[in-house]
Amino acid sequence: MKFTKGHGTQNDFVVLPDVHIKRDLSVAAVQALCDRQRGLGADGVLRVTTVGAALEGGVLAEKPAGVSSEDWFMDYRNADGSIAEMCGNGVRVFAHYLRSVGLEHRDEFVVASLAGPRPVRINSWSQLTADVTVDMGPVKEFGAGEAIVGGRRFSGLAIDVGNPHLACVDAVLTTEQLRILDVGAPVTFDEQLFPDGVNVEVLTAPSAGPANTVHMRVHERGVGETRSCGTGTVAAAYAALRHIGQRTGEVVVNIPGGQVRVTVTGESSFLRGPSMLLADGEISDEWWGGIGACG
């Protein structure tokens, strides 16, 4: 089976073109693929298919609201094999892949996800890199909570961007303190507020100046710390705006993997950032057949 390796601000993925759902992406298969010692290594897997094929293949039980059977469907799996509703960095890489291999000839089209339709605009692209804007949909705030990250307690906003987030703005946190924080360690959070788990973002307060700029690190549900999280940057941008008494505006978010720009409006939110497709290859049938025996 062919694959492409790509990343969006160093949030990396194995892209599998499997339009007709010929492979079973079992938990074991995804875990093995994403393992950085015995597999290709990635934060997640992006299967390329369509809504119609996903319905026929049993990947989707029902059609997500607002999409058509002909729309591309991003079947996204976390590194632990769990199914995720949405991944903003993944959508950029997914859209770039479609354009680069000729499966899509438009610069503006819809990528469907379990969280619903995500319209994308490819601002520029080459076989290697792309600049992509994703309409991430409305940001929904549904409360406040706390998390313990790296032994430190943080307060934040509970935010839905198609998946759950706790975005914690710390007014006294310096960029150096953020840099050395142990974000990779298991986090503690309110399981009643987040019964299905949560992505936790820790960020500095917005800097003064014409551009609201923050620094962020993230512990992703089902993965651990990643170099970037697209939906997490949107949640962080919204929390940063709320911190300065706003609900709309633009925020530049710096993550360990690079920088993205988030715009929050009254109706939606937009994530603009890079994508890179760095390698193509083929996974042998023998490897697929031996997944269960991999040590």
Curated annotation (Swiss-Prot):
The keyword Cytoplasm applies. It is an enzyme of class 5 (isomerase). PROSITE patterns: DAP_EPIMERASE. One of its GO terms (molecular function) is diaminopimelate epimerase activity. It is found in: Cytoplasm. GO terms for cellular component: cytosol. The record marks H165, E220 as: Could be important to modulate the pK values of the two catalytic cysteine residues. Its main location: cytoplasm. Catalyzes the stereoinversion of LL-2,6-diaminopimelate (L,L-DAP) to meso-diaminopimelate (meso-DAP), a precursor of L-lysine and an essential component of the bacterial peptidoglycan. This is Diaminopimelate epimerase. It comes from Mycobacteroides abscessus (strain ATCC 19977 / DSM 44196 / CCUG 20993 / CIP 104536 / JCM 13569 / NCTC 13031 / TMC 1543 / L948). The lineage of its organism: Bacteria, Bacillati, Actinomycetota, Actinomycetes, Mycobacteriales. The gene is dapF.
